[in-house]
Amino acid sequence: MIPGELRVNDDLGQIELNVGRTTQTLSVANYGDRPIQVGSHYHFYEVNEALHFEREPTKGFRLNIPAGMAIRFEPGQRRTIELVEFAGKREIYGFQAAIMGNVDGHITATISDDKEVK
């Protein structure tokens, strides 16, 4: 083997991601004046409010792209994207704190500009 050489088993073919999970296609527009980049595992319901789309159906979904990748929305740009449901326990914490727990039986917090920690 040569240092840095990659040996790939071509017999494996293509690797399919997120097989059997619910997906949805969505049109998203950036109404802001700056580019917005969204990472692969960011809870799409909680993305920057300058991105306009119907939010409610996106609870519990993320971008259907490989881990570590992102999609960039330029100002004024409209894109059609595909989302995939979160799997596992479907517990979502952090982001903008809109859902702090199980997405299927969540308690919704209000997304606001109030930065005070209580």
Curated annotation (Swiss-Prot):
Its main location: cytoplasm. Pfam families: Urease_beta. Its EC number is 3.5.1.5. Pathway: Nitrogen metabolism; urea degradation; CO(2) and NH(3) from urea (urease route): step 1/1. CDD domains: Urease_beta. It catalyses: urea + 2 H2O + H(+) = hydrogencarbonate + 2 NH4(+). Heterotrimer of UreA (gamma), UreB (beta) and UreC (alpha) subunits. Three heterotrimers associate to form the active enzyme. Belongs to the urease beta subunit family. This is Urease subunit beta. It comes from Aliivibrio fischeri (strain MJ11).
